[in-house]
Design a protein with these regions (language model features):
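Class I SAM-dependent methyltransferase SAM/SAH-binding core
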Residues: 36-90, 114
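A short SAM/SAH-binding and catalytic strip from SAM-dependent methyltransferases
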Residues: 99-112, 135
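A structural alpha-helix within SAM-dependent methyltransferase catalytic domains
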Residues: 26, 49-52, 116-120, 147
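Conserved catalytic/acceptor-binding region of the Class I
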Residues: 113-114, 120-195, 211, 244
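Conserved class I S-adenosyl-L-methionine
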Residues: 1-35, 46-54, 67-72, 76, ...
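A short acidic, Gly/Pro-enriched loop at the edge of an enzyme's catalytic core
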Residues: 88-100
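Conserved Class I S-adenosyl-L-methionine
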Residues: 3, 17, 44-46, 163-252
């Protein structure tokens, strides 16, 4: 999969949905004024922006393995500490944050268990770890129609339903396994309006994430067939895309 893409590509592909989830994840985390918070896998900064609005730039740090996303997050939020790094090896000392959050990231970690253990490590005792992942197993995501079409047409690709946290209860299992306590889980909902089918379809060509990576392997005929099936699955434009994410909160 690839996230070595311009920030604007991610914004159009997934950022429009991420911005809907960010305030809900922060509500679940129940942060307090003065908390020092880390955004793990920050991307171009959808969750980061919400954190800055609520807590101020001086209370927020962010990290991402994509150089282009780190550059974008730094440009958009010049007052915060944004570092290049992977979730599995966070470039911070033990217990330096009051909370560590990961929005739409756990399922994309190379080693989700290790990434969550690192989030626990850098969070103080009594602090909070929270995360959310699309309900890929239920197909209720911005990508559901695409994966449905790909699977129906037998294009030989594995969708994202098997990934960490992408089914009900799995984030809770992962949180328990890394020692978190007082765990809560819930669903988050994102509602995004599209004025045309192509507004939803075209960003797949940007090569973002597993779906975008697969799209780039398809030839012109295969892309046309997937597009035709997606047109049948989705309502006439304009339409609202309603997506669901599983979310969990635990205490260190």
């Amino acid at each position: 999969m690839s996230f070595d893409v311009p920030a604007e590509a991610y914004d159009r592909f997934m950022g429009v949905h991420s911005r809907q989830l960010a305030p809900q994840l922060l509500d679940l985390a129940r942060l307090s004024s003065g908390d020092r918070v880390l955004d793990v896998g920050c991307g171009p900064g959808a969750l980061t922006a919400e954190l800055v609005d609520r807590l101020g730039a001086g209370s927020v740090a962010a990290v991402d393995p994509s150089e282009s996303f780190v550059a974008a997050a730094r440009a958009r939020h010049p007052g915060i500490d944004v570092r290049l790094g992977a979730a599995e090896a966070l470039p911070y000392d033990d217990g330096v944050f009051d909370a560590s959050l990961a929005q739409l990231v756990v399922h994309l970690m190379a080693d989700p268990a290790a990434g969550l253990r690192e989030m626990v490590r850098v969070t103080r005792r009594g602090g909070v770890v929270a995360a959310c992942v699309w309900d890929h197993a239920g197909g209720r995501t911005p990508l559901g129609s695409f994966w449905h079409a790909v699977n129906e047409l037998g294009l030989g690709a594995r969708d994202e339903s098997h990934l960490a946290g992408a089914r009900e209860g799995h984030l809770v299992e992962l949180f328990k396994a890394c020692g978190l306590r007082d765990i809560e889980d819930t669903q988050l909902v994102a509602r995004v309006e599209y004025s045309s089918f192509d507004e939803w379809w075209e960003p797949f060509g940007f090569g973002v994430g597993p779906a975008g990576a697969l799209f780039q392997t398809l030839d012109a005929d295969q892309r046309a067939r997937v597009r035709a099936r997606c047109l049948e699955f989705l309502p006439p434009a304009p339409f609202e895309f309603v997506s669901f994410a599983w979310a969990a909160r635990g205490v260190v």
